[in-house]
């Protein structure tokens, strides 16, 4: 540490060894400080909702256009990086990208980790059997591990999934991801990883994650129809 920067110089700053540090006070204009405190205290979303109505329409539209362009560039850069990582495999890149978006922010990283760990060549051999796809997807996610489900909730179907995954795991020498990566707090039930994975099972089984089908969709309605996923019967009540 070579410099301590603060808003108010009210004490001597020292390192862990006791050495005094040079300090720099940066004065913040009162209106900026007030806006900062107001934004931090605001519980409504978005916090800036009081300010936006007072801005010129052209300013707001310009800001939104810039944000849209930045977001698209960010998404394109991520896809380019995935495409390089998969050595130009558009099918796998599409699957990973779709999975990441099923995480809806909170579980985006976990879903991407899961998709990167998903051997699509192995899954493809069992694609026509939705139960085997389900066992493979949930098993690779670590969600069939005993520690992830209370003993009283391990019903016959769950145990059957576990057994099937053990078979597939041995057959393809698989290693599941760390289930601790999944987040459940402050999520609505429909956004739980189990539900989103069950939807991925249905989409994959019905070949609606195929890159060729998605890019050949002619209309927004057709694309929405392809991505309109339901869950397998078991997960409708779990």
Task: Give short role names for the model-derived ranges.
Residues 67-238:
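Hydrophobic, aromatic-lined core segments that form the binding pocket/scaffold
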Residues 4-123:
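Internal, well-ordered alpha/beta segment that forms a basic, Gly-enriched binding/recognition surface
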């Amino acid at each position: 540490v070579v410099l301590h920067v603060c808003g108010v110089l009210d004490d001597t700053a020292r390192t862990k060894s006791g050495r005094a540090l040079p300090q720099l006070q940066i004065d913040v204009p009162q209106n900026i400080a007030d806006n900062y405190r107001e934004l931090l205290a605001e519980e409504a979303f978005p916090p800036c909702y009081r300010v936006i109505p007072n801005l010129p329409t052209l300013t707001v539209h310009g800001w939104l256009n810039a944000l849209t362009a930045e977001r698209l560039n960010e998404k394109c850069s991520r896809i380019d990086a995935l495409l390089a990582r998969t050595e130009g495999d558009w099918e796998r890149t599409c699957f990973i990208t779709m999975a990441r978006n099923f995480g809806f922010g909170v579980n985006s990283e976990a879903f991407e980790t899961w998709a990167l760990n998903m051997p699509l060549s192995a899954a493809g051999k069992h694609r026509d059997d939705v139960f085997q796809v389900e066992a493979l997807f949930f098993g690779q996610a670590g969600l069939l591990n005993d520690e992830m489900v209370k003993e009283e909730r391990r019903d016959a179907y769950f145990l059957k999934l576990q057994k099937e995954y053990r078979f597939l795991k041995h057959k393809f020498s698989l290693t599941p991801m760390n289930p601790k990566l999944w987040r459940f707090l402050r999520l609505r039930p429909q956004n739980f990883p189990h539900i989103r994975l069950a939807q991925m099972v249905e989409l994959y089984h019905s070949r609606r994650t195929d890159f060729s089908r998605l890019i050949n969709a002619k209309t927004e309605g057709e694309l929405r129809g392809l991505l309109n996923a339901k869950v397998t019967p078991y997960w409708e009540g779990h």
